From Swiss-Prot:
It is found in: Lysosome membrane; Early endosome membrane; Cell membrane. This is Mechanosensitive cation channel TMEM63A. Its main location: membrane. PANTHER family: CSC1-LIKE PROTEIN 1, PROBABLE MEMBRANE PROTEIN DUF221-RELATED. It comes from Capra hircus. GO terms for cellular component: early endosome membrane; lysosomal membrane; plasma membrane. Residues 554-585 are annotated as: Gating helix. It holds the Pfam family PHM7_cyt. Residues 218-413 are annotated as: Intracellular linker IL2.
Length: 803
């Protein structure tokens, strides 16, 4: 059988590339194992340094647990738990539970170790009631990953590991980590087929487990959200009555309940937050004067709390007089801003209809592609106001949850938003492009003899624990940088913000943690030498050295560091503790310190947490075949991560109300992990066996088919909105079943926004049923609280963070 011309051309081109890279048809394996003798990162340690790193990391984890227990006992007021205590001093930490136990007292959890048992005593019903549906879906995702890793651990340790140990390419030293990797097998060993088959099996298992998880994601679609459309592209001078008349004329069968135009209220939100803080401080000192009968004097100047004597320009003044003056000044600014807001429309509107089917019909009319002959037009139904309103430029979508909208960011749109987005991400990319791996830093130290004697680095603590700890530190810093960059992008919804955050953090972490270290310790140096230095004797680079026998030990140590140090630091929440301490020190008065305590609880960042966990999961799956010993440590990581997140979701963070798309996006990213495993096996086969090897061709075919399926799925997902059938959600049996099972009221209840008077007290939060799409009076009054929070204190805190 003769090869096709395409295959012959591809083969000749591949041979040329392999010769350019210094890869022969039968590579000299001993070259890779002996060429790194001057490197200090992967040699000279027992079993890749894993026992030493494991002992150090477990010791650090136990130390962090002790520190956290002490802090939780003595300084517990830097999280959500402080809000409950602040608002209910008579019965501290008493929460209404939906379980049969009724009211449960969590005061005992302030003990040094009693909080550990509380993690296991928490039921999903309690978490659902207190933290919302998103927390349940997040924890369910972790449980599916745990079950998947249990199966993968059994297969990798019971089948793949003995196969790797059966090889004889490396020495027989029982303390050699390389014997446990795929590098221990000869190139002519037929057992290499087993690795590819199990990689395909892992891919199938991942799809099955993730499919089961997605089927369990059932959101209770609120009637208010499904009946409300978000319209952008309106003329700035459009009137509420005109928009309402257009919908009634163009769609006579659809009854409009309410139309609310959007305005630029960013500054108004800021002023209302400051007024709320000022009123709380004024109330605090008023009550203190009534209780003690004495006036309190404060120094309101910047850093005035550090002044020990009264000097000119740093005088003390009466606290009640100061905060009364501040409140009056803020009230004047709020009144002026309310008048200006009326002249700053944004060209957006929320339109609520009588029934879900009406909103769905109009959404289909605006977005579905209607083909007539050879032309496809998407013009919606006209009315007498169509030209005035410019309906051809409208963009119509379902409205997000009221709690999900970032009101202050709605004013940033169009060219300004895109310019801001491109500028932020360009600066982020340039900055992170030069943030290389710590392994390259250590290898550079070796090259320039920074550390003398050079062999002193052969200690496992330096050569394995330090680089993995440094890598984890960089990967811990990266989400923080990306999170702040995402916040600066001014997304309109918190769901979109978390989704973009998850994607960006995951991509950057994968490049930093997995791809760059896998290219070799001096991969950048090799690349530029190969690209520019044509005369150097080292211009011929052996890429098969990427799969060094001990290369997997670095990633095993990274997973161990993430499991113990990473989860320990996440439980401790050191960045939040440092920020809390700094804000408490910089607070000028006792009332300000009280406000700091009440504003210290934040919503859970599902996007960043998903990305962090998926990065480690991808590392585990990518090396589950080539380095099977990594899988049980990955299982330990996910188990500890699950326990830590259960604690933090319930006791430390405020609930968040997000769209379900972020959970489906996490599933899609999880499917990338076994695909990377196939990539690793293909590269190994290509570099070690050659292109003509049957195993290489088979792995390439499987990988190509997998990528094609993923691309097809992604493309269909991108163009799904063009199908009119996509909008017939009210006909779905699943939706009907969800509504029947949830025992919700009929979805045709008319939407009436709860507009609060501007004179309402700022200390009274909205009830969970008081959902509104943010009229001006609502923002100048009390900001809507979180509908999920079951305690008034959480509602107040969520209102303070409303954007």
């Amino acid at each position: 059988m003769t090869d096709s011309p395409f295959l012959e051309l591809w083969q000749s081109r591949t041979v040329a590339i392999r010769e350019r890279l210094g890869i022969g048809d039968q590579p000299n394996d001993s070259y890779c194992y002996n060429s790194a003798k001057n490197s200090t990162v992967l040699q000279g340690v027992t079993f890749g340094g894993i026992p030493t790193v494991l002992f150090i990391d477990v010791s650090c984890f136990l130390f962090l647990i002790v520190v956290f227990s002490i802090i939780r006992r003595k300084f517990w007021d830097y999280g959500r738990i402080a809000l409950v205590s602040e608002g209910n001093s008579e019965s501290r930490f008493r929460r209404l539970s939906s379980s049969s136990s009724g009211q449960q007292d969590f005061e005992s959890e302030l003990g040094c170790c009693s909080w550990l048992t509380a993690i296991f005593r928490l039921h999903d019903d309690q978490i659902l009631e207190w933290c919302g549906e998103d927390a349940i879906h997040y924890l369910s995702f972790q449980r599916h990953i745990i079950f998947l890793l249990v199966v993968v651990s059994c297969l990798s340790l019971c089948i793949i590991l003995p196969v790797n140990l059966s090889g004889d390419l490396l020495d027989k030293d029982p303390y050699s980590f390389g014997r446990t990797t795929i590098a221990n097998l000869q190139t002519d060993n037929n057992l290499l087929w087993l690795h590819t088959i199990f990689a395909i099996l892992y891919l199938i298992l991942t799809v099955v487990f993730m499919r089961h998880h997605t089927q369990s994601i059932k959101y209770k679609e609120e009637s208010l959200v499904r009946r409300t459309l978000f319209v952008t592209g309106l003329p700035k001078d459009a009137k509420k009555e005109t928009v309402e008349s257009h919908f009634r004329d163009a769609y006579p069968t659809c009854e409009v309940v309410e139309v609310q135009l959007c305005y630029n209220v960013a500054k108004l939100i800021y002023l209302c937050k400051e007024r709320k803080k000022t009123e709380k401080s004024l109330t605090y000192y008023t009550n203190l004067q009534v209780k003690t009968g004495q006036r309190t004097f404060i120094n309101p100047k910047p850093c005035g709390q550090f002044c020990c004597c009264e000097v000119r320009g740093c005088e003390w003044e009466d606290a009640i007089s100061y905060y009364t003056r501040m409140k009056d000044r803020l009230m004047e600014r709020i009144t002026e801003e309310e008048c200006r807001v009326q002249d700053q429309p944004l060209g957006m509107a929320f339109v609520t209809f009588q029934e879900k089917s009406m909103a769905t019909y109009i959404l289909k009319d605006f977005n579905a592609c209607k083909c007539q002959g050879l032309q496809c037009k998407g013009e919606p139904q006209p009315s007498s106001h169509s030209r005035e309103l410019g309906i051809s430029r409208w963009s119509v979508t379902f409205a997000a949850y009221p709690e999900d909208i970032c009101w202050k960011n709605l004013s940033i749109q169009g060219f300004r938003w895109w310019f801001q987005w491109l500028g932020i991400n360009f600066i982020l990319f340039v900055g992170l492009f030069f943030l290389t791996t710590p392994s390259i830093i250590l290898s550079t130290m070796d090259k320039f003899n920074v550390t003398k004697p050079i062999h002193a680095l052969n200690d496992p603590i330096i050569s394995q624990f330090f680089p993995t700890l440094l890598l984890w530190s960089f990967s811990a810093l990266l989400p923080t940088i990306v999170c702040y960059s995402t916040l600066l992008e001014s997304h309109w919804t918190k769901s979109g913000e978390n989704r973009i955050m998850m994607t960006k953090v995951y991509i950057f972490l994968i490049f930093m943690v997995l791809i760059l270290p896998s290219l070799g310790l001096t991969s950048l140096d090799f690349f530029f030498r190969w690209l520019f230095d044509k005369t150097s004797s080292e211009a011929s680079i052996r890429l098969e050295c990427v799969f060094l026998p001990d290369q997997g030990a670095f990633f095993v140590n990274y997973v161990i560091a993430s499991a113990f140090i990473g989860n320990g630091m996440e439980l401790l929440r050191l960045p939040g503790l440092i920020l809390y301490t700094f804000r408490m020190v910089m607070a000028k008065t006792a009332a300000d310190r009280r406000n700091v305590k009440q504003h210290q609880a934040f919503e859970y960042e599902f996007g960043a947490m998903y990305a962090w966990m998926l990065c480690v999961f991808t590392v585990i799956m990518a090396y589950s075949i080539t380095c099977p010993i990594i899988v049980p440590f990955g299982l330990i990581y996910i188990l500890l991560k699950h326990m830590v997140d259960r604690h933090n979701l319930y006791f430390a963070y405020l609930p968040a109300k997000l769209e379900k798309r972020i959970h489906f996006a996490a599933v899609n990213q999880a499917l990338a992990a076994p695909i990377l495993c196939l990539f690793w096996l293909y590269f190994f086969s290509f570099l070690r066996l050659g292109l003509k090897a049957p195993l290489t061709l088979f792995t390439f075919l499987v990988l190509l088919l997998t990528i094609l399926v993923c691309l097809a799925y992604t493309c269909f997902g991108c163009f799904r909105h063009l199908s009119p059938l996509n909008y017939k959600t009210e006909e779905s049996a699943n939706d009907k079943g969800n509504e029947a099972g949830a025992h919700v009221p009929p979805p045709f209840t008319p939407y009436v926004p709860r507009i609060l008077n501007s004179s309402s007290s700022e200390k009274t939060a909205l009830s969970p049923q008081q959902q509104t799409y943010g009229a001006i009076n609502n923002i100048s009054g009390t900001v809507a609280g979180q509908g999920l929070a079951q305690s008034p204190e959480d509602s107040v805190a969520a209102a303070d963070q409303e954007d």
